[in-house]
């Protein structure tokens, strides 16, 4: 992407990518790599794990609609959230979500092939095509920070719905490590979350025996996901956008860009072969002086 035209650049960690994809690979969807002419991807969007965590706390009842959406597991009834209890309930709720997620995607891909098989595009790919089954995670850093807050600080339910009794808001007392600061206490939770979700996806049958993958990526959908997600134990307010991709939660990174990227690099790429996205905004002057007279625009013939 040309920085002088649109003001943004996409940097790819080629050294890591080549190990899996070889020299001749392409970015087929946002941050998803593929061996050119040899593979195709069944697109998978994202699962809102932030909302899944709230479902785990509230026994499958949606905080925004007050409707029973997930399975009616026993909710957390104590006012102080206990880490082991919340993680156990969250793990069980992720099982339900992964099963629903993969089943819906299988249906979509089957019906798409049935009614709109992309023959023209497939003609450009090898006969024995390798198929990957993409999935994704939204709300990644908010889940990590919420679990970290429950583990290392004191999180209490500060408001309950008078009709359903579900938790509506949380109060956090004390400090806690946050993802994006090169702190292993938070980053270890991030690694656990990624592996746990991928393992659950891999247990399900995927359409045409495609290889299950996952990503930590949102482009603008984090805004919509956030609109329908309630208050989080990490302090994020209901209705506000989720942090994009594998970015730290808004305002959580306190140790600078390198610390944020160090947290990112602890996430094993082989567990997120559909891609890991980290979006940074910075003042151009932070990169050093730029001589605009030396910028050249591309020529399109």
Where are these regions (language model features)?
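Active-site-adjacent bridging/hinge elements
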Residues: 71-77, 109-124
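Ordered core of a single globular domain
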Residues: 129-295, 301
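Single conserved hydrophobic/aromatic residue that forms the stacking wall/gate
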Residues: 1-7, 294, 299-301
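Structural signal for hydrophobic packing residues in well-ordered secondary-structure cores
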Residues: 61, 83-116, 144-155, 190-209
């Amino acid at each position: 992407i040309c920085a002088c035209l649109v003001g943004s650049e996409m940097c790819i960690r080629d050294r890591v990518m080549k190990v899996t994809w070889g020299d001749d690979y392409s970015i087929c969807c946002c941050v998803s790599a593929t061996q050119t002419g040899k593979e195709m991807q069944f697109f998978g969007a994202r699962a809102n794990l932030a909302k899944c965590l709230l479902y785990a706390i509230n026994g499958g009842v949606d905080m925004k609609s007050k409707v029973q959406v997930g399975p009616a597991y026993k909710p957390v009834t104590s006012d102080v959230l206990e880490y082991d209890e919340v993680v156990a309930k969250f793990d069980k709720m992720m099982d339900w979500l992964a099963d629903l997620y993969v089943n819906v995607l299988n249906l979509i891909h089957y019906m798409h092939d049935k009614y709109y098989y992309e023959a023209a595009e497939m003609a450009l790919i090898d006969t024995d095509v390798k198929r990957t089954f993409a999935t994704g995670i939204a709300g990644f850093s908010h889940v990590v920070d919420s679990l970290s807050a429950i583990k290392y600080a004191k999180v209490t339910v500060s408001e309950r719905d008078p009709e359903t009794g579900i938790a509506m808001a949380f109060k956090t007392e004390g400090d806690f490590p946050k993802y994006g600061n090169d702190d292993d206490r938070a980053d270890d939770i991030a690694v656990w979350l990624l592996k746990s979700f991928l393992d659950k996806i891999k247990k399900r049958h995927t359409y045409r025996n495609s290889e299950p993958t996952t990503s930590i990526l949102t482009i603008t959908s984090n805004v919509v996901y956030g609109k329908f997600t309630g208050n989080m134990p990490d302090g994020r307010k209901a209705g506000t956008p989720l942090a994009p991709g594998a970015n730290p939660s808004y305002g959580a990174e306190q140790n600078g860009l390198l610390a944020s990227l160090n947290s990112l690099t602890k996430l094993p790429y082989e567990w997120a072969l559909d891609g890991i996205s980290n979006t940074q905004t910075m003042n151009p002057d932070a990169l050093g002086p730029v001589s605009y007279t030396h910028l050249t625009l591309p020529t399109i013939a």
